[in-house]
Curated annotation (Swiss-Prot):
Annotated NCBIfam families: eno
Record's keyword terms, sorted: Cytoplasm, Glycolysis, Lyase, Magnesium, Metal-binding, Secreted
Entry-linked CDD domains: enolase
Cofactor (UniProt): Mg(2+)
Function statement: Catalyzes the reversible conversion of 2-phosphoglycerate (2-PG) into phosphoenolpyruvate (PEP). It is essential for the degradation of carbohydrates via glycolysis.
SUPFAM superfamilies assigned: Enolase C-terminal domain-like (SSF51604), Enolase N-terminal domain-like (SSF54826)
Organism of this sequence: Thermoanaerobacter sp. (strain X514)
Protein family according to the UniProt entry: Belongs to the enolase family.
Subcellular location: Cytoplasm; Secreted; Cell surface
Taxonomy of the source species: Bacteria, Bacillati, Bacillota, Clostridia, Thermoanaerobacterales
Record's protein name: Enolase
Catalytic reactions of this protein: (2R)-2-phosphoglycerate = phosphoenolpyruvate + H2O
Signal peptide coordinates: none
Superkingdom field: Bacteria
Residues of the active site: E205, K338
Length: 429
């Protein structure tokens, strides 16, 4: 085992041109780990705090020099000398050093950068790929991509209310073929949109962002693209939605679909999602209701929880306390896992473990503001999660994760598993 001899943070840019934190950790063996921290656009109110400088004269107030300084001046002196493989102790030390419930003192972006860089350095020290260091000898499940190919909401400058329309290649025999299927549908979608005279500009996550007559039209053009690519909707490829309903939820307690000019109550939202699920091959809905609409979520779960995957993102924010509440209430049946929502690798793994024990799936996810860091690719295999959400097959910040998964599948060889439809163990057959 090797101890930490140096920790250094710097300010770099993410995929939106905003600053973020990158951390390097060096061990006395010479092993080095480097990690960059992502950033979300539609963020849950209960997420750990991303520390920004607020100095409008630099990066419009979005600088992260305070977080960088916190790593270099406060966290580093505390952790230097600790054993890199003591991940739980290291993360615990940072949580205690911060001392707030939401990491607002040091910043979740500072703490997470160190947490992940430590894990990477320890993996290198052990001579193991990161996925195997995290998951051990049984880390072998490649994820079904939940690929966002059409963007709306906060991820795009268009009139589509639902934030993400995604495809999932459940009929693929392995990850490599799954990625090919998604890429072919993506290119066919571009042609379909072109043929209708619609825009093929892309949103933050690489999906197309056209103006459409309705949210339902988005589903229809994707189904057309799936068929044009030679695949059967509902068999080869299924659909997933992320309405990001918290963004639609207003002070009147109702959901405002501003693109369509429609206002819905919680009960009407449940009716709306049920109608879409009955009409189209939708297998997963994320954040179908707002983060504090627990009663609405309970109704949604009662109506659709045995039929499709209901993913809590803003609802759970990778937080075991909120997940525990959801489990006890019988709300949702899946959790979205975003490292920077909670701020340490240890707490992320705790949330995944709690979800699995309760029969909930865990979907490992990127953020809309990403970097070339591909840690989540290793994480999703390490914990055998079976599903990953990391954008369209466009923009290097997204493709970096897919390419890392291709490499991992290649290394695993015949031991690699791709679960397809069996990834949804939370849906009662």
């Amino acid at each position: 085992m090797s101890s930490i001899i140096d920790i250094f943070a710097r300010e770099i840019l993410d995929s939106r041109g905003n600053p973020t934190v990158e951390v390097e950790v060096e061990l006395d063996s010479g092993a080095v780990g480097r990690a960059a921290v992502p950033s979300g656009a539609s963020t849950g109110a209960f997420e750990a705090v991303e520390l920004r400088d607020g100095d409008k004269s630099r990066y419009l107030g979005k600088g992260v020099l305070k977080a960088v300084q916190n790593v270099n001046d406060i966290i580093a002196p505390e952790l230097i000398g600790m054993e890199a493989q003591d991940q739980v102790a290291i993360d615990k030390a940072m949580i205690e050093l911060d001392g707030t419930p939401n990491k607002s003192k040091l910043g979740a972006n500072a703490i997470l950068g160190v947490s992940l860089a430590v894990a990477k350095a320890a993996a290198e020290e052990c001579g193991l790929p990161l996925y195997q260091y995290i998951g051990g000898v049984n880390a072998k499940t490649l994820p079904v991509p939940m690929m966002n190919i059409l963007n709306g909401g906060k991820h795009a400058d268009n009139n589509v209310d639902i934030q993400e329309f995604m495809i999932m290649p459940v009929g693929a025999p392995n990850f490599r073929e799954a990625l090919r299927m998604c890429s072919e549908v993506y290119h066919n979608l571009k042609n379909v949109l072109h043929s209708k005279g619609l825009s093929t500009t892309v949103g933050d996550e690489g999906g197309f962002a056209p103006n459409l007559t309705s949210n339902e039209e988005a589903i229809q053009v994707i189904l057309e693209a799936i068929e044009k690519a030679g695949y059967v909707p509902g068999e080869d490829i299924v659909l997933a939605l992320d309405p990001a309903a918290t963004e639609m939820y207003k002070e009147d307690g109702k959901y405002h679909f501003e693109g369509e000019g429609i206002v819905r109550t919680s009960a009407e939202m449940v009716d709306f999602w049920e109608q879409l699920v009955n009409k189209y091959p939708i297998v997963s809905i994320e954040d179908g209701l707002a983060e504090e609409d627990w009663n609405g979520w309970k109704l949604l779960t009662e109506r659709l929880g045995k039929k499709i995957q209901l993913v809590g993102d803003d609802l759970f924010v990778t937080n075991t306390q909120r997940l525990s509440k959801g489990i006890s209430m019988g709300v949702a049946n899946s959790i979205l896992i975003k490292l920077n929502q909670i701020g340490t690798l240890t707490e992320t793994l705790d949330a995944i473990e709690m979800a699995k024990r309760a029969g909930y799936t865990a979907v490992v996810s990127h953020r809309s503001g990403e970097t070339e860091d591909s840690t989540i690719a290793d994480l999703v295999v390490g914990v055998n999660a079976g599903q990953i959400k990391t954008g369209a097959p466009a923009r290097t910040d997204r493709v970096a994760k897919y390419n890392q998964l291709l490499r991992i599948e290649e290394v695993l060889g015949s031991t690699a598993q791709y679960l397809g439809k069996n990834a949804f163990y939370n849906i009662k057959k």
